[in-house]
Design a protein with these regions (language model features):
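Non-heme di-metal
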Residues: 1-106
């Protein structure tokens, strides 16, 4: 069971690193640093390869029908259960940027 938890944690970490590096690449492009942007994109691709390997090892890639159902379930859960309290809490704390970010994710 610890290995499955480790795979889940590794998958989450690799996935987050991928998205972060792509955001860094975009910023480097905006600052006219194409070489650095390319480096970040290469690192992001490597993180994707790692994340996919972890997902496969967890048995997380199934038939397309199963994958579609999983995606629908996940998006519905975010929309109905995750983001509404996040929006409310950000609003209560006066954090407009977080409130907007959470609301746009719904």
């Amino acid at each position: 069971m610890a290995t499955l938890d480790n795979l889940k944690g590794a998958f989450a970490g690799e996935s987050q690193a991928n998205r972060k590096y792509l955001a860094y690449a975009k910023k480097a492009d905006q600052e006219n640093l194409p070489g650095i942007a390319k480096l970040f994109r290469a690192a992001a691709h490597a993180e994707t390869v790692h994340a996919h390997a972890h997902l496969r090892a967890m048995g997380g890639i199934k038939s397309t029908l199963d994958n579609l159902q999983d995606a629908v379930n996940g998006e519905d859960f975010e929309f109905t259960r995750i983001y509404p309290p996040y929006v409310a809490e950000a609003k209560a704390e006066g954090n407009a940027a977080a409130e907007r970010s959470f609301a746009y994710a719904m």
